[in-house]
Structure formats: C-alpha cells, structure tokens
C-alpha cells in the first residue's frame, strides 16, 4: 500500500463553523458515521461505522504509517477527526507527532497527508 484516498462523514453537536475542527472533535458526541477509502486506486470501500462496522486493521495501521500517503479533500479536517477516532477507539495504535514546542498536540503527523483541495487550487 502506497496511497490511500479517504473521505469521511461526521457528526458533532458542536457547530464546526463557529468553533473549528478541534472543538468539534473534542465533543463527547463527535463521531465518524462513514469512512470511505480507496487503496492505490482500487475500488472504493465504505465502512458504515454508525451501523457498527469496523475499519479493517490494515487501514487503521496505514493511518499511522508515514510511508503511506493519505489523500483527502481538506485533509486537515480528516486528519484531526481520525486522530480523535483513533485515540478513542484504537488507543493502542494511535501515534501522535507532538513536540514540546507544538501548542496543538495529540494528533496524527501531517507529514504523509496530502490535500486534494489545495492541489486543485494550483490547477
């Protein structure tokens, strides 16, 4: 696995536009409802987390693997949401990148995340 394209649908009782992504995911009512992904251009798979389905282990592992490039439209949102999801549901697999100088800690490293929204702005 070299690339994974990701799209999520989420819910929170916190207004994203008023409070931003960090407060949005910190709500105890935050949840990821749907997790869509495609590995290396293969067929899209959709995991209905709200219906009790689980993300496959190889995909969970890929989320913390910096050698796997993660692609998403507005990847910052996906990265922060998935960080919170991993922290809650897979704490044994969650790896944060925080350094002492970082004021926003406990999130997945942005190193291997690519934003298609940003890339499309250059086209």
Report the location of each language-model feature.
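Conserved DEDDh/DEDDy metal-dependent 3′-5′ exonuclease domain
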Residues: 2-5, 10, 15-19, 23-123
């Amino acid at each position: 696995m070299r690339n994974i394209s990701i799209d999520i649908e989420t819910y929170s009782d916190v207004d994203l536009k008023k409070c931003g992504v960090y407060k949005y995911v910190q709500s105890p009512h935050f949840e990821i409802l749907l997790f869509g992904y495609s590995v290396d251009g293969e067929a899209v798979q959709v995991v209905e987390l709200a219906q009790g389905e689980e993300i496959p282990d190889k995909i969970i592992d890929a989320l913390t693997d910096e050698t796997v490039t993660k692609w998403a439209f507005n990847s910052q949102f996906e990265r922060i949401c998935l960080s919170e999801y991993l922290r809650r549901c897979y704490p044994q697999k969650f790896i944060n990148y925080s350094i002492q100088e970082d004021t926003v800690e406990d999130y997945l490293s942005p190193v291997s995340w690519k934003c298609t929204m940003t890339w499309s702005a250059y086209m």
